[in-house]
A protein has these predicted regions:
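Extreme N-terminal leader/targeting segments of oxidoreductases
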Residues: 1-24
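Long, amphipathic alpha-helical stalk/connector segments used for oligomerization, subunit docking
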Residues: 478-557
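Conserved beta-strand-loop-beta-strand element in the redox core of flavoprotein oxidoreductases
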Residues: 186-209, 216
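Core beta-strand elements of the Rossmann-like FAD/NAD(P) dinucleotide-binding domain
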Residues: 19-22, 205-215, 442
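N-terminal Rossmann-like FAD-binding beta1-loop-alpha1 element of flavoenzymes
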Residues: 24-49
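Mobile, glycine/GP-rich and aromatic-enriched active-site lid/loop segments adjacent to catalytic centers
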Residues: 109, 117-183, 188-194, 261-454, ...
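Glycine-rich loop(s) and the adjacent beta-strand/alpha-helix scaffold that form part
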Residues: 218-279, 459-473
Length: 648
């Protein structure tokens, strides 16, 4: 171990091992993890949560959220869960997780009430927006996007993680913070065996933690930093927090877990040094919907409904078109327009230029009605993740007044940056772990929730699937006896953890992360062929055999960062294998094979799942509707939960 340039402020405990025992182990204490802990506790299980940061602000949503999507059972919704999840599936041409999104639509409102019960703010209790058309006067709920159908709720998400942590602790969950899970343990140490616990490391002391568990729930978000990483500014390399590094993906792959849709990656948006801060430049989407836009000469940009009808008022931007039941915005909407589900939008940039509009464009809140202006620059920007301090506070202190000033758009039209085709990221509904109706993976004893699942998205989805996976894991834990750890496997994991301490100054974690992104951009970018992908696997394998073995750590912090980059390397390998397995191009998946140019041929309109074997990698095709009848299967698997709700 090379010396640190400054004294390490915590005691070093590399030689110590803490052993714990529980019924349900939750890995990751973000939105999904906190709810998984609550769900498992509600089902009577002992619960330990392993979180590598401080839970009160950890995870992809730790810095806030501005809306709760798809709350189809809230008292004001005019859309039922079956309608909404059917639309979400059709919006993505079937490439969606029907199980997890049905859970989201069916149970999301329940979870929002759980957060409110723990003092999270979900209503306009201060009566700041009395009389606004997006407010329901009886419930004091505020709605976003579709004001007619009211299934997306504006929330004060800055209060949510505090509330979730309180709620889980009140139920009896034990949180072990600043400790990263680094490896899963299996019965008898067997590849593909039942999962019986995990190993982790404390990022301050370096102490190893070994936890034996009857069931384990993975809640560590989606991977980042696979195609995008800036050595000089690692904290803004990706849209999501940089510590979201695919830990669940990598740990579970190493023991035989199955994944799908990881071939889907879109051209990057809102990330790194090519981009202005997300939602900090002029735009009209998501948190800023439906802000008025103007061109360089002050001409207002027209808003159109799905039929091309120009909308005369701001109010119409939040309403379905004549004859349209509802539209999708704010989570789950399609990447490519679907007529039945398309909501109001501004005229496309290429058409604007043809009509003589001048770049750059600007977001002009001063032209919005006062209530709309305050709810965007206040509730939305004030509560969305990464917005409160770097945008709301910083811009206000710099003198920005939304009633007077405009914000410029950058990149392509209203977007905040411009990227090269090979610069990709997991955005929208990416791939992840395959799941059944218990949110169990293909490995016994291993469950997943939130962004660890395939086709996942948003805060409400994370919370709903977290609680669901937690209670099903608890049910399983009650049915099994004690589990035993395989000590040679534990020692192997410990040796792997501390190996970088013995290296001289060679390769840093930043250098390895940057090298991974170069390989992925060159061999798994916008266009793919078998030859490129095979060479990509070889290049990643070379990085693992050579550079990864020379990684050097100065302290426990470095050990954590090294484990993250090793997880990125493993996840990158899964991605390339997923791309190799799909022998067809796909519009919906943003997937282009030069050697298989046919777009979505019928025989490939299926999920392609990959998993490691002891001799290589296996793949199989799974029907897009493998989940069967959604309401029937849900009710069959959740009778106890539904009965408990009826008794309330």
């Amino acid at each position: 171990m090379i010396p640190s340039p400054v004294p390490w402020p915590y005691p070093i405990e590399f030689d110590q091992v803490e052993r714990l025992d529980t019924d349900v182990l939750v890995l990751g204490g973000g939105a999904a993890g906190c709810m998984a802990a609550s769900g498992a506790c509600d089902a009577g299980a002992r619960v330990i949560v392993l979180e590598k940061a401080a839970t009160i602000a950890s995870g992809a949503s730790g810095s806030g959220s501005d809306h709760w999507e798809s709350a189809a059972t809230n008292p004001c919704s005019k859309v039922i869960p079956e309608e909404l999840v059917d639309a979400m599936i059709r919006a993505h041409d079937g490439f969606n997780n029907g199980i997890s999104h049905y859970i989201e639509c069916r149970e999301g409102w329940d979870r929002l009430l759980d957060i409110e019960a723990a003092r999270g703010k979900i209503r306009d209790t201060d009566d700041q927006f009395v009389g606004a058309e997006f407010r329901d006067e009886k419930t004091k709920l505020l709605f976003a996007y579709d004001y007619e159908n009211r299934f997306n709720i504006r929330v004060w998400g800055q209060t949510f993680k505090h509330a979730q942590l309180r709620g889980a602790k009140r139920r009896g969950a034990k949180f072990i913070e600043r400790t990263m899970a680094t490896g899963l343990l299996t019965e008898g140490g067997r590849f593909g065996g039942r999962v019986v616990g995990a190993v982790g490391i404390n990022g301050r002391t370096g102490k190893c933690v070994v936890i034996r568990a009857k069931a384990t729930v993975l809640c560590t978000s989606r991977p980042t930093r696979i195609w995008l990483f800036t050595i000089g500014a690692p904290g803004i390399s990706e849209f999501r927090p940089p510590q979201c590094t695919g830990d669940a993906h990598a740990m579970s792959w190493r023991i035989g877990a199955e994944f799908t849709m990881l071939e889907k990656a879109i051209k990057a948006e809102w990330s790194g040094t090519r981009s202005f801060p997300p939602y900090g430049a002029g735009n009209n989407h998501n948190s800023w919907y439906a802000c008025t836009m103007v061109d360089a000469e002050g001409r207002e940009i027209p808003w159109l409904d799905r039929d091309g009808r120009e909308l005369a008022t701001v109010s119409e931007r939040y309403r379905p078109a004549p004859g349209q039941k509802f539209f999708l915005k704010g989570g789950g909407e399609p990447d490519f327009p679907v007529y039945e589900l398309t909501g109001p939008e501004t005229l496309p940039v290429d058409e604007l230029l043809k009509r003589g509009y001048k770049l750059p464009l600007y977001a002009d809140l001063s032209r919005m009605p006062e209530m709309e202006r305050r709810v965007i620059w206040g509730v939305m920007i004030g509560n969305e993740g990464k917005m409160k301090i770097p945008i709301m506070q910083a811009y206000t202190q710099a003198g920005f007044d939304p009633a007077k000033h405009m914000l410029q758009s950058y990149g392509d039209g209203w977007k905040s940056g411009a990227f090269l085709p090979q610069e990709r990221q997991f955005f929208g509904l990416p791939g992840g772990l395959m799941n059944d109706w218990h949110l169990r993976t293909n490995l016994e004893g291993l469950y997943a929730a939130g962004d660890a699942l395939f086709a996942s998205n948003c805060y409400g989805h994370a919370c709903a699937t977290g609680h669901y996976a937690g209670r099903h894991a608890a049910r399983y834990a009650k049915q099994v006896g004690d589990v035993a750890l395989h000590e040679p496997q534990v020692e192997e994991q410990r040796a792997r953890l501390y190996r970088p301490l013995g290296n001289e100054k060679e390769v840093t974690w930043q250098e390895l992360n940057f090298a991974i992104t170069r390989v992925m951009q060159h061999h798994c970018g916008a266009f793919k062929t078998d030859q490129l992908l095979v060479r990509g696997i070889a290049a990643l394998d070379e990085l693992e055999r050579q550079e990864a073995s020379r990684l050097v750590a100065r302290n426990p912090h470095d050990l954590i960062r090294i484990q993250e980059v090793l997880n990125i390397l493993t996840t990158a390998t899964i991605v390339v294998h997923s791309c190799l397995a799909r022998k067809a191009s796909s519009k919906t998946l943003h997937f282009s094979r030069l050697d298989y140019p046919g777009i979505d041929p019928p025989e490939w309109r299926q999920f392609v799942a990959v998993r490691p074997t002891e001799g290589g990698v296996a793949s199989r095709q799974i029907p897009l509707d493998y989940y069967g009848d959604l309401p029937d299967n849900y009710q069959r698997e959740n009778r106890d939960y539904l009965e408990a709700r009826r008794k309330r």
